[in-house]
A protein has these predicted regions:
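Mixed-charge, Lys/Arg-enriched low-complexity segments
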Residues: 3-8, 52-123
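A detector for short, charged/polar N-terminal pre-domain segments
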Residues: 7-17
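Short, exposed beta-strand/loop patches in secreted or surface proteins that constitute
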Residues: 15-19, 40-41
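Short, hydrophobic/aromatic-rich segments at coil-to-beta transitions
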Residues: 19-26
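Active-site beta-strand termini and strand-to-loop segments that position acidic
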Residues: 28-30
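Short aromatic-glycine-(Arg/Gly/Cys) micro-motifs in beta-strand/loop hairpins
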Residues: 32-57
Length: 123
């Protein structure tokens, strides 16, 4: 009889792309939906700062937009980002959206393992 121990299964990883374009942070999921996550601005000293709309998370002092995106990638959780894709309108409907040539990074986030509680303290 096979052992059906679900606690040893690896979590499923979901791919996303994060973009910095025209002063905004965008995310794209595997279904190609694009959402606007918040602002990215250049401070007086030349460094970049971001502010996410959904949870007011912010940070600054980044030399490049890519560094800011990497910081977001390190702190964002799957449940929060997945919830944003449910709650926020598809930015592809905005005629002004242009991600060609935008700074971007690829990330993968772990979904919840089976049996784990669906609570995200970062929301």
């Amino acid at each position: 009889m096979a052992n059906d121990d679900t606690t040893t299964r690896s979590p499923v990883r979901q791919p996303f792309l994060l973009y910095a374009a025209k002063g905004r942070i965008y995310a794209r999921n595997r279904t190609q939906k694009v959402i606007d996550l918040g602002a990215i601005t250049r401070e007086d000293g030349g460094s970049f700062r971001y502010l996410l709309d959904g949870n007011q998370q912010s940070d600054g002092g980044f030399f490049t937009e890519e560094e800011a995106l990497q910081a977001i990638a390190r702190s964002v959780r799957f449940l929060w980002l997945d919830g944003q894709f449910t709650a926020v309108a598809d930015a592809r409907d905005d005629a002004n959206l242009d991600l060609d040539g935008a700074t971007r990074i690829s990330i993968e986030l772990d979904e919840m393992p089976p049996g784990e509680r669906a609570v995200d303290a970062t929301v």
